[in-house]
Amino acid sequence: MQMIAEIYYERGTIVVKGDAHVPHAKFDSRSGTYRALAFRYRDIIEYFESNGIEFVDNAADPIPTPYFDAEISLRDYQEKALERWLVDKRGCIVLPTGSGKTHVAMAAINELSTPTLIVVPTLALAEQWKERLGIFGEEYVGEFSGRIKELKPLTVSTYDSAYVNAEKLGNRFMLLIFDEVHHLPAESYVQIAQMSIAPFRLGLTATFEREDGRHEILKEVVGGKVFELFPDSLAGKHLAKYTIKRIFVPLAEDERVEYEKREKVYKQFLRARGITLRRAEDFNKIVMASGYDERAYEALRAWEEARRIAFNSKNKIRKLREILERHRKDKIIIFTRHNELVYRISKVFLIPAITHRTSREEREEILEGFRTGRFRAIVSSQVLDEGIDVPDANVGVIMSGSGSAREYIQRLGRILRPSKGKKEAVLYELISRGTGEVNTARRRKNAAKGAA
């Protein structure tokens, strides 16, 4: 007679006692048990049920959760996204910034009424989620972070806190929602998903793919893409119509001389070492070598200085002045890659600046001033690229940035949020002519095509 299998949760893993075969598990001869990472919980349960294997489930310890019946109305594409996800209750929804990914997730919570852990990149995003989740009842909303540790039916945590406490959280929630899910494949963060038994999983992002290819891991620990829309699909109806204007700006003569000097050092190093840059990994080898190879270090410094010159050119500042004059009645967000240019623009044009150094209180005050019209422009490094709700804006200016699709789409999304009476949005890209920034802009352009 077959012994009834017993399932336990132990420190991010599932332990099964009994003589039944357990898929995805390894047998531990010392304890006579099978052990698997906790995310295999659903697979193991389904295997036992489909094969008529009796079992006792002592793994789950879910937080008691009420039945939710909030009024949540969805747009047509949000309904389709939710329907696709509900088929298996696993997978990632890819929607443009400003199109209501959070709204879809809240509808999923409403459908399942099960203890839910929402994982977000920043505390600022945690605050936004807690506010939105209030429609289910503030008494059911908690935060588990470095500053607060409360487990409620709907708990919001940062990736950092969820990773550090993955073992503790692993059997308390049945639904995991990963906001900005492209962060999850990092070697540390992926353990949040691997060490949880949650049978239901939802990933949200505007850009699913990662340049390092690690997004493939999401298919196993969260689920693949179940629904995807790009900005052009929603422009004019659910998002503002937009145009992209690329302006090529020459370097000043003194900048040109310095740029070419730095570029020469870098290219001579590549030729001397026979290095051809085809992928990000090729450049990363130079970065690694710079720790012990003086020539590699000098080449990397020359490359960084050349980029700084291209990103921060004087003529870009002059062109920005023209754009600010042209759009003096519009709301403008200026994006840069580095804080140095943020503070320079803030000082020259008396525009409020938001960087990682800006306190939460000051950031909220600036964004409120932007919302009410007290400020018509703000300038930021990468802080506003992701997650933070930015008030209505219809003009964006990219002073400098990377060539990644994610950064581009997120910056574009900042000016596409629909609002009453909003006219066509404009995104300017200022590019230093004859520099490596041209190639960076080309990659952004390709990203734009992919978003069409």
UniProtKB/Swiss-Prot annotation:
Helicase ATP-binding domain sequence ranges: 82-226
Q: What residues bind ATP, as annotated? A: L95, P96, T97, G98, S99, G100, K101, T102
Pfam families, per this entry? Helicase_C, ResIII, XPB_DRD
What highest taxon heads this organism's lineage?
Archaea
Top-level class of the enzyme under EC nomenclature: isomerase
Q: What temperature-related properties of activity are listed for this protein? A: Optimum temperature is 50 degrees Celsius for 3'-5' helicase activity, still active at 65, inactive at 37 degrees Celsius.
Query: Where do the record's region annotations for ThM region lie?
Result: 251-312
Instruction: Motif DEAH box: list the residue ranges.
Output: 179-182
Determine if Nucleotide-binding is one of this entry's keywords: yes
Enzyme Commission identifier(s): 5.6.2.4
Q: What is known of its domains?
A: The N-terminus (residues 1-217) binds dsDNA with an abasic nucleotide but not DNA with 5-hydroxyl-cytidine (a non-distorting lesion) or undamaged single-stranded (ss) or double-stranded (ds) DNA. The DRD domain (residues 1-60) structurally resembles the mismatch recognition domain of MutS. The C-terminus (residues 236-434) binds ssDNA and dsDNA. The C-terminus binds Bax1. The N- and C-terminal domains are joined by a flexible hinge region which allows the two domains to rotate and form either an open conformation (no ATPase activity) or closed (has ATPase) activity.
The text of the family note is: Belongs to the helicase family. RAD25/XPB subfamily.
Per UniProt, subunit arrangement is: Forms a heterodimer with Bax1.
Q: Any additional notes?
A: Conventional DNA helicases unwind DNA by binding to a ssDNA overhang of dsDNA and then translocating on this strand with cycles of ATP binding and hydrolysis to 'unzip' the dsDNA. XPB is believed to be an unconventional DNA helicase principally because it translocates in a 3'-5' direction along dsDNA instead of ssDNA, thus it is referred to as a DNA translocase.
Functional note = ATP-dependent DNA translocase which moves along double-stranded DNA (dsDNA) in a 3'-5' direction, unwinding the DNA. Unwinds DNA with a 3'-overhang but not a 5'-overhang or blunt-ended undamaged DNA; does unwind damaged blunt-ended DNA (cyclobutane pyrimidine dimer or thymine (6-4) thymine photoproduct). Binds single-stranded (ss) and dsDNA, as well as damaged DNA. Has very low ATPase activity that is repressed by Bax1; Y-form DNA and a DNA substrate with a 6 base pair bubble in the center stimulate the XPB-Bax1 ATPase activity about 6- to 10-fold.
Protein name (record) = DNA 3'-5' translocase XPB
